């Protein structure tokens, strides 16, 4: 399967979560969906991740993940462009890869994946990137679910 990454916009991403962007003028933006938690035993978790860029396009993968009890937010601290790949839930509960979408984010855009939203592990382009990652965790295997999916590729538009 071949996906073409489209520019990340709040409208296009709304079904999967929330786009995190600073306001264009002085002020504050609130992102209340960034802290969703459905597990009373979980605690908030903040991690800082440094990630090497993808060596070459296209992105080729056969894995998706979700967090059954927590949203997960990626906030760029020092980043170039990066990819957010998402899929709605299929009737069997797994990712519906036939309806998967790929988004090309700018280095000043973050996302919150909603609770239980299938997504690909985040992939950075251009250069080493640093992100803050916020989610809820209880330290068990239930925090993360990874599944194999049919192979797919993500390309940038021509």
Annotate each predicted stretch with a short phrase.
Residues 104-118:
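Conserved metal-binding segment of the jelly-roll/cupin
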Residues 116-132:
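Ligand-binding loop in jelly-roll beta-barrel domains
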Residues 83-84, 112, 120, 133:
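Short hydrophobic/aromatic-rich beta-strand segments that constitute the beta-sheet cores
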Residues 1-102, 126, 135-142, 147-148, ...:
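Non-catalytic, conserved peripheral segments adjacent to functional cores
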Residues 72, 111, 129:
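Residue-level detector of short, conserved catalytic/binding motifs and their immediate flanks
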């Amino acid at each position: 399967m071949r996906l073409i990454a489209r520019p990340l916009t709040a409208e296009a991403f709304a079904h999967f979560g929330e786009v995190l962007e600073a306001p264009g003028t002085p002020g504050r933006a609130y992102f209340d969906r960034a802290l969703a938690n459905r597990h009373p035993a979980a605690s908030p978790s903040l991690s800082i991740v440094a990630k090497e860029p993808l060596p070459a396009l296209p992105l080729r993968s056969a894995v998706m993940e979700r967090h059954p009890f927590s949203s997960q937010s990626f906030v760029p601290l020092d980043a170039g462009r990066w990819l957010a790949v998402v899929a709605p839930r299929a009737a069997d509960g797994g990712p519906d890869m036939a309806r998967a979408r790929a988004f090309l984010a700018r280095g000043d855009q973050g996302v919150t994946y909603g609770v239980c939203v299938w997504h690909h592990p985040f992939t950075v382009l251009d250069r080493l990137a640093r992100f803050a990652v916020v989610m809820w965790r209880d330290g068990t295997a239930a925090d993360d679910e990874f599944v194999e999916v049919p192979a797919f590729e993500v390309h940038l538009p021509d």
